[in-house]
Amino acid sequence: SGYRGSPLGGYDQELWRAKKWLKEQDIHFVPGVNEELGATAVWGSQHVALNPKAERDGVFGIWYGKGPGLDRAMDVLKHGNAAGTSAHGGVLAIVGDDHGAKSSTLPHQSDHNFQAAFVPFLAPASVHEFVEYGLLGIAMSRFAGTWVGFKATADTVETSATVDLSGENRGIIIPSFEFPDGGVHIRPGDIWREEDTRLQRYKGFAAMAFAKANGIDRVVWDSPKPRIGIVSTGKAFADTMEALDELGIDARVAADIGLKVYKVGMPWPLEPDGIRAFAEGLDEVLVIEEKREFIEHQLKWQLYNWRESVRPRVVGKHDESGEWLLSPDNELSPGVIAHVIAARLQHFHNTDRI
């Protein structure tokens, strides 16, 4: 349930078109009168397991809405996330981000809303990853007891692709994690202080453990003699790989010149072990992300207590002198990213193409 809005303007149309198939799979599509009522209905789906007369072990729920709809539904997200999901249910919250305000009165970036609601979220970079991350997101929601956000942009959700579904039968790894007595899932007669304790002390850490076990964040390119690393996510990652191709840099060239690339699938909370291992031995980390800095702030915080002699320089929206590198007031493009990468590489690698 949810409410339509670009770039998710066609989602409900496709669900209506697939109504016969959905009914056969016992999937109910009930669009909301508005975003918050849709989110409330999805929250209600997690209560099924609490009913002793329930006919199902659990129900998974998907909420959808564009950026301003997330603003409207924040109270529901906060309460639903704090209450928790069902162990056999789970909730995926799909948000359409219009970074360039192409069909909105203001640009929108859902990252900070999800963080404020303490909702872990995933950022797919391709049509294929909508399937992969969607399945991972529901499994993460069941494991960690949280709602899981899911960023959709026009560059991914309003495109088409051929996806080989045979590769989606991957085994999802359930990590070892020490949960509190009684677990972290929804329960009857809960006390709000206890809800908040589970949220603050366990759920986010459980999400990070799940992300680490399932390789949601990963090294894409490595180098035996690393000097500079690029960290990116979602649409910006796809643009970054295109920019590197325009510069004539592939995995072999990157390994030779000391360039590493790290793809973040879960921008918040940023899983610390993987990103720290990636940053070891680097002179510089360039963070490429849409709109305001988000991963960049988390990375700087995680590396802050490293000794200065081993801590890499971290740049993104600004360079080390405070000058703009990747401005937040427009959408990024492969061309803009290519210029920034070329400028950061020229100190130790330059070619006619660059």
Regions found by a protein language model. Name each.
Residues S1-V127, T153-D155, P224-R227, V231, ...:
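Thiamine diphosphate
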Residues P124-I354:
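Flexible, low-complexity linker and terminal segments
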